[in-house]
């Protein structure tokens, strides 16, 4: 296990339809607030778009969205919702340079193996244009490992996430927030939100 976890991808492949059916159609309010930071028509890369709920709302607000997911079955569901191509791409396959005004990763990077995060975060930084924004949410409060559904979580602490992002590139700002919430199957979870802005030059 280095840059991706096969059992976790397998879970989402097998459970794609069931997982999407549990997801409300409303956009995550944390993302809605983040989008207010962006200029109209901003080019957004979404990593781990799932069934495409957040992408649909971003598109409805006039943003130029590039939705991606590492699981083909998820991408297919998102394509039906969005009526557009959804690329099948794992986090470690991101190789674009200075192409996006924002990179959104809502409850997706939390499945990336900790050892693979430095390279992934560096790729995200590289994909952003100068002054671009990055939004990500993670689960926190436990040691990295698998949940009862067989999904891997890196469970980063605020300090760990901040150190990893700082090492990934030159950021103008990196801000965090934590709150109690729920995850899949309405299981209690502590969430960590990260918003960073790439340096202007």
Give the label of every model feature segment.
Residues 1-39, 41-50, 142:
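Conserved class I S-adenosyl-L-methionine
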Residues 51-93:
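Class I SAM-dependent methyltransferase SAM/SAH-binding core
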Residues 93-103:
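A short acidic, Gly/Pro-enriched loop at the edge of an enzyme's catalytic core
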Residues 118-130:
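A short glycine-rich, Lys/Arg-flanked "PGG" loop and its adjoining helix->strand segment in the class I
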Residues 131-138:
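Conserved beta-strand signature within the Rossmann-like core of class I S-adenosyl-L-methionine
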Residues 145-160, 184:
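Acceptor-substrate binding/catalytic loop of class I
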Residues 170-182:
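Conserved S-adenosyl-L-methionine
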């Amino acid at each position: 296990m280095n840059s991706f976890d096969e059992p976790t991808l397998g879970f989402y492949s097998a459970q794609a339809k069931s997982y999407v059916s549990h997801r409300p159609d409303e956009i995550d309010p944390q993302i809605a607030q983040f989008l207010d930071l962006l200029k109209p028509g901003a080019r957004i890369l979404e990593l781990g778009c799932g069934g495409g709920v957040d992408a649909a709302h971003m598109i409805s607000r006039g943003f130029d969205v590039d939705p991606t997911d590492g699981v083909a079955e998820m991408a297919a569901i998102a394509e039906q919702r969005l009526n557009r191509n959804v690329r099948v791409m794992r986090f470690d396959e991101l190789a674009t340079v200075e192409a996006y005004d924002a990179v959104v990763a809502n409850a997706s990077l939390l499945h990336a193996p900790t050892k693979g995060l430095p390279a992934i975060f560096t790729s995200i930084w590289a994909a952003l244009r100068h002054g671009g924004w990055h939004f990500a949410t993670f689960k926190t409060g436990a040691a990295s490992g698998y949940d009862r559904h067989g999904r891997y979580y890196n469970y980063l602490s605020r300090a760990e996430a901040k150190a990893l992002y700082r090492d990934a590139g030159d950021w103008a700002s990196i801000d965090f927030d934590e709150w109690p919430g729920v995850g899949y199957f309405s299981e209690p979870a502590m969430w960590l939100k990260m918003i960073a802005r790439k340096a202007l030059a």
